[in-house]
Design a protein with these regions (language model features):
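C-terminal cap/linker of serine protease catalytic domains
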Residues: 11, 15, 185, 189-246
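Active-site-proximal beta-strands of protease catalytic cores
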Residues: 23-27, 58-63, 126-139, 170-171, ...
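PDZ/PDZ-like groove recognition
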Residues: 40, 45, 220-272
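Active-site substrate-binding loop(s) of clan PA
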Residues: 50, 86-88, 106-142, 173-174, ...
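Catalytic-histidine neighborhood of serine endopeptidases
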Residues: 55-97, 101-104
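Active-site region of chymotrypsin-like
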Residues: 103-119, 147-207, 247-255
Length: 272
């Protein structure tokens, strides 16, 4: 009945308030001078999620694009508290970055009572289709927006340089400029929202990189480590391709990026 319906959404609202303690707004501030020597300031925003605390810094996973050319990075926490941040490391393949806020600029009571470090769950679970999720950050293209829904598919992958990423598709109608994270109902991040990875006829449906495929990258960025780069895109050779076409098992190279180490080493499209 209607009372049960209200109770469900009341419980969801309470859950969202708890999860939002780990969600922040990231603002990249850039300055320039126009033709008349007037200083112009531009701001680009995204959402971020607090992923770790290393004893000196609070680490935040966010989109790389707003901070790429930024002269200053400002993080707005829950309750409107702001602090400056620095770029720890970026991953241009996924368009993600880790930024750091120094702990000594934040009040101890605030750190203890008002923010939460997000728990990274697993996206490689059986029967993930149908799993209820909450999208937080900016799923509607606006910071602070949210959406409720389910995972509808995890069958597609996004090929990137030297790796592939599992894509979680949802039934949440969002923005083509969506960002943020997907939480399951156990308080765990299971996906990082990305735009441009949905099927052509589902452009406004929120989708996300599965968190399991990103964990190694997140760890390296959190430690300020660079990524090894070959410049290859490929797919696994299927049993059908092996039996019907005689293609040996392995990684079938679908693309070699121009001037990449792989290209300079003589690796070509079609190699296995």
């Amino acid at each position: 009945d209607l009372d049960n319906y209200k109770q469900i959404y009341s419980a969801l609202a309470q859950y969202v308030a708890e999860m939002n303690r780990s969600i922040v707004t990231v603002t990249g501030v850039s300055s320039g001078v126009d033709w008349f020597n007037n200083v112009n300031e531009s701001k680009n925003q995204s959402s971020g999620v607090i992923i770790a605390q290393n004893g000196k810094q609070l680490l935040i996973l966010t989109d790389y694009s707003p901070v790429k050319q930024a002269d200053d990075i400002i993080v707005t926490f829950n309750k409107g508290i702001q602090a400056h941040a620095s770029l720890k490391e970026k991953d241009e393949t996924t368009g993600l970055a880790v930024i750091a806020v120094e702990l000594d600029v934040l009040n101890e009571d605030f750190l203890k009572n008002d923010i939460t470090i997000a728990t990274l769950g697993s996206s490689n679970i059986r029967d993930i289709a149908g799993l209820p999720v909450v999208a937080l950050g900016r799923p509607m293209g606006i910071n602070g927006s949210l959406g409720y829904g389910i995972i509808t598919s995890s069958a597609s992958e996004s090929a990137a340089s030297d790796t592939t990423y599992r894509i979680l598709q949802t039934n949440i109608v969002g923005s083509q400029n969506a960002g943020g994270v997907l939480f399951n109902l156990q308080g765990q991040v299971i996906g990082i929202i990305t735009n441009g990875k949905s099927a052509t006829d589902m452009k406004n449906m929120v989708c996300a990189y599965g968190i399991t495929d990103l964990k190694r990258h997140i760890e390296k960025m959190s430690n300020g480590e660079k990524f090894a780069y070959l410049g290859l895109k490929g797919v696994d050779v299927t049993e059908e391709a092996n039996s019907e076409l005689g293609v040996p098992y392995g990684a079938y190279i679908t693309e070699v990026e121009m001037d990449s180490p792989a290209m300079l080493a003589g690796i070509q499209q079609g190699d296995v």
